[in-house]
Amino acid sequence: MPFFDEAASNAWVPSQNEVAQRWQKKVAEFDGYIFVTAEYNRGIPAVLKNALDYAYPEWNKKPTAFVGYGSVGAARAIEQMRLIAIELQMAPTRTGVHIQGADFMSVWKGAKEITELSYLQQNATDMLDQLVWWANALKAARERPTVSAAA
């Protein structure tokens, strides 16, 4: 996907880039999302931010959950993702999965199996339960007719 080079967000004007249009259609197909991210220099990778910026209405009123890996389990990157998700009118889950740097490296190098990281199972289960609950609730809400606050 090219770097964002549109006149404005597709919340305001349609994207001109064909790749962006295909991405927006793909994003619109889903009722919720799980983002897996590393943490680089205390933030999310630029390509992830770029992908998020290329869509707007397609993310709205949908839940999202986060899995991160890095020296502090990508805690700072995931906090940034939560802020971005809220701006995109998404509902982030409270629980995420944070894979600590030493654990990630042990699994990556083959010294451990990911199943040996017992703390991940409960966090993953909680995160997925929250994501499914929000996905069901928000899908039902999106399918109902909109009621004005003035009503």
Predicted regions and their residues:
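N-terminal beta1-alpha1-beta2 submodule of the flavodoxin-like/Rossmannoid cofactor-binding fold
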Residues: M1-T37, R42-N50, Y54, K112-T125, ...
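A generic "cationic amphipathic patch" detector
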Residues: A46-V47, T64, A77, R94, ...
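Short, surface-exposed basic-aromatic patches at helix termini and helix-loop junctions that form
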Residues: P57
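Short, glycine-/small-residue-rich phosphate/pyrophosphate-handling segment
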Residues: N60-W108, E116-N123
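Rossmann-like dinucleotide/phosphate-binding beta-alpha-beta segment
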Residues: E87-A91, V132-A137
